[in-house]
Structures are given as structure tokens and as C-alpha cells.
């Protein structure tokens, strides 16, 4: 039987007959390349699916007082002995682990995760604000800071423009304020003119 046939047959019997599926998968694992532990149990060869296993994350061990002292000595550039270096390397290479408990065989499989050295190297390769500014093209720089805006300073702006704007604004405000008084003045002048015309007509009639 070929490896591909064993794998497909195991997948076919996964829900119909789990015992037959585990037997076929065991034959496949013993003769072909092993499948990862994230999809099968390495002990009973049960396909992992929702409800047939329990997963928990085991964190990295915390640094002790001795390891904290060694880390301070290393950051200060002091020389460490061979034993101290080995202890420090063991701490840096420690990683978290994913613990999966199979409900069929009740055995726990351990899958290692990332260690501290890998996390430090990944953090160093991340982009920084300086590197982001280096990758900016000249076009984006020109768009971000136009010359007309960048060259304008408070000292270079003409004072006449500011004075004109202030005078125009003051004239507008004064015209708005004095408009009711101007209308009232015009009304009074019209009344005086009308009264003057009436008096002239009386004088003319009396003279006749």
C-alpha cells in the first residue's frame, strides 16, 4: 500500500471508525515522513479535532535572582565564567511550550515554541522610525513639505497684507455697526425737507 493511500484511507475512516483510522495512520507514520504533532497525537495517532484534546500554553520560566545578576553583568560588559555563561545561555534558549492532552490515550504531547534569542532577533529586525524615513522617495518628501509652505516664515510675510486685512475688517465692522444710525439720519433729513417745502407754500399763499 502506498503512503498516499494510507493517508487518504485514514482520513476517510476518521469519523466512521476511529480505531481503523488510527491503525492506518500508524502504518503511514512508521513508513513515511512523520506528520506534525499539531494535527495528530504522536502516541495513539488520533486526528486532532475539536473536542478530542485539550491544549494549554506553558510559559517560559521566570528569571531567578542569580540570572538577573548575570544579565546585569552581561549588559555592563563584565566578563563571565564558563559556568555563568552556560547558565545564561540555557535561560536565553528556554522557550514556551504548547501542551496538548489527548482524550483518547490521556497522554500529553509537548510542542516547543519560540525561545528568547529568537524573539530578540525578531525585535531587532523590525522597522524603526529612522528606517521608515530612509525608505521615503523624493516625491513623497516633496509632497509632504511643499516649498511654498516651508519657505514662508513670520519674518518673510509682508506687513502690508496684514495691515490691509485688519483695515478691511475694521471698516466692515464699523459699517455694520453704523448702518442703523445712517438710516435714521436719512429719515430725519427727509422729514425736515418736507416740512421746509410745506412752510414755503404757506408763505407763498399768504403773500397772495
Curated annotation (Swiss-Prot):
<dbReference type="Pfam" id="PF15719">
    <property type="entry name" value="DUF4674"/>
</dbReference>
<feature type="region of interest" description="Disordered">
    <location>
        <begin position="189"/>
        <end position="208"/>
    </location>
</feature>
<feature type="compositionally biased region" description="Low complexity">
    <location>
        <begin position="153"/>
        <end position="180"/>
    </location>
</feature>
<protein>
    <recommendedName>
        <fullName>UPF0711 protein C18orf21 homolog</fullName>
    </recommendedName>
</protein>
<feature type="compositionally biased region" description="Polar residues">
    <location>
        <begin position="138"/>
        <end position="152"/>
    </location>
</feature>
<comment type="similarity">
    <text>Belongs to the UPF0711 family.</text>
</comment>
<feature type="compositionally biased region" description="Basic residues">
    <location>
        <begin position="123"/>
        <end position="137"/>
    </location>
</feature>
<feature type="region of interest" description="Disordered">
    <location>
        <begin position="123"/>
        <end position="180"/>
    </location>
</feature>
<dbReference type="InterPro" id="IPR029779">
    <property type="entry name" value="DUF4674"/>
</dbReference>
